[in-house]
Amino acid sequence: MNLMFMMLIIMLINLGISFYNARSAGQVWAESKAIGGWLRLLVWCGAIQAAIGFTMVYLIIVSYIAVSVGYISPQLMGVLFNLVYLMIIVPVIGTGIIITIQSWIAVARERSLMNIGTAGWNTFATAYNTYNAIQSFGPALSSVQEGLSGLFDEDSDSDNSTYRVILLAAIVLLAGVVTTSVIIRRYAASLPVSEEVRNAGLRDLSTR
């Protein structure tokens, strides 16, 4: 019960951060497209971070439903998590580094408590994600290679299970992208770009 409660809290926090990033990106999406440059890059980073966050929430929900109804085995749920992890970890680290650089630029321009806190969190999150990737990428890749070996076997049951894992991974990734796109379109051009935004970019994006 406690584990489920903690997982629910984490999912809600992830949803909140993802929605915030998607909305922030949407508010200046059209303007950043016109301005281009560093601001446009930051907006894309925010959108990618949002899509990844939504994807992870959908992954948890879909994987547990899939196991509960017998669509995939509990063992393949781990393979599914590792497959999605391999797909998102490079974008997570890449966008996190860019957002972290911007957050420290914001601190250099204005030493406020909020800017320092945001920069500190982004630095910690990016460092943790990078360290975790170094430790986890190899085992995750091995798990996926072993779990998806059914693609090359003559066992039809194994082959079907493999395709199911790939299908679920594609579904949750697509759902994360679509959710982000809908939010961006909903809030597009709802916030004028001030001179401060042109100079500083999206200083309040949060990485994960």
What are these regions (language model features)?
Residues M1-L3, T207-R208:
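Short, Lys/Arg-enriched, disordered terminal segments
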Residues G120, F124, L191-R208:
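Short, highly charged, low-complexity non-transmembrane loops/tails of multi-pass membrane proteins
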